Every structure is written in structure tokens, then in C-alpha cells.
């Protein structure tokens, strides 16, 4: 199960959800070679045990090169993707597997940060576009290595411009609430999400239109 950065919008800030900048995301992912599962991670049913052999860190590094940049990825069956009005995960739970079209994604960085050649356990740091399934990326890397692989842990370290240093654990918020202490210091202004964008000055007419939800075509 993924942990890490998850921005939560409250009050009037929720109005910005539909116009959020298309920020890229950064993940730290752990994997295990030699296994495959129906969900492509450790939480699913193990479907196959494979011989790993003498796969080295160098072998993995060479394979990762094929998965950097603009690539096509087939979404997993256990996902919220809709096909013919049905969620894939609903079909998967019924034991139904359907054809899925590959989708374009971008993997900006893909680095092997740790690998144990005895246990075949490793870690990756990944910066990617929205819509990228990390467990599928790991599954495909395992297939390319010829031994299979599953994701064992996933931490989102950056999303919507926020990092782990900006975050507070849900358990800590609950403790504050139980103690009657305000959590206001953990609230950020919505402007933080748009901080990387260039400012555009609107005239009064344009401002009126924008405040009423009308999209503006500004060159």
C-alpha cells in the first residue's frame, strides 16, 4: 500500500482541484525479483516463483534504460481505469481479464538506489508523469530481466509541489484533535500549489469571467 505525500484540500481550496498544475510525482519503491502476483505487488496473490539466477546491479541498470523517457504502459487489471463502463478492479475481482490499451507515460528519472544480489531485493527512485503505475513499471522491468518482479513498498515523496517535510501523519493529527490542539500550523495557503507558475495579470472583465468559472484563452 502506498504511503507518503497526499495533499488534502479543504474549504474553498477544493475549488482549485480541477485546475491543479500537472505536477510530476516522485516515488521511492522497493521490489523483489523472482515473484509475480495478480496485483503486481506484495499484497496480491503470488502467481509465480521464478529462478532469478545471477542478476547483478549492472544487469538491472542496463535494463532500466529501456524504461526511461516517453514509453507506453498497459494499465494493470487491478486499477480504477474504466472500460465499457466498468472499473478494471471490479472485473479483476470476478476473475475476468480484458484487453487494455497501452497509454503514454513519461519516466523522467529511474535510478537503482539499492540492490542485494543474495536476496534479490532492491530499491528504486522514480520521477514520473501522472497516470504512471509504479507496480506495473516494476512488473515490466522484472519481465525484461526474465525473472519477474513485484513491488513490496511504495512511498510518494513529492506531489503537487509538496514533499514529505511538508506533511503530517494522520495519527499525529488525531492526537492533536483528541487533545483539543489546533492543527492550523499544518495548513498551507492554496497559493503554494501554484507557486511554480508564471503570474498573469487579468483586467476587470477577465477577472469577473474567471471568478465565475469561465476558462480564459490568454496568449
Question: Whereabouts are the PLM-identified features?
Answer:
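Extended alpha-helical targeting/anchoring segments
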Residues: 78-79, 83-108
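Glycine/acidic-rich beta-strand-loop module
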Residues: 1-21, 90
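The conserved catalytic core of RNA pseudouridine synthases
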Residues: 7, 97-131, 135-146
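Acidic, low-complexity central loop/insert segments
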Residues: 13, 19-72
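Accessory RNA 3′-end/elbow-binding domains used by RNA modification enzymes
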Residues: 3-5, 23, 58-63, 121, ...
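Structural signature of FAD isoalloxazine-binding scaffolds in flavoprotein oxidoreductases
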Residues: 18-33, 98-112
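Short, conserved beta-turn/loop elements at beta-strand boundaries and strand-helix junctions
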Residues: 37, 69, 100-101, 115-118, ...
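Residue-level signal for inorganic ion chemistry
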Residues: 8, 29, 85, 137, ...
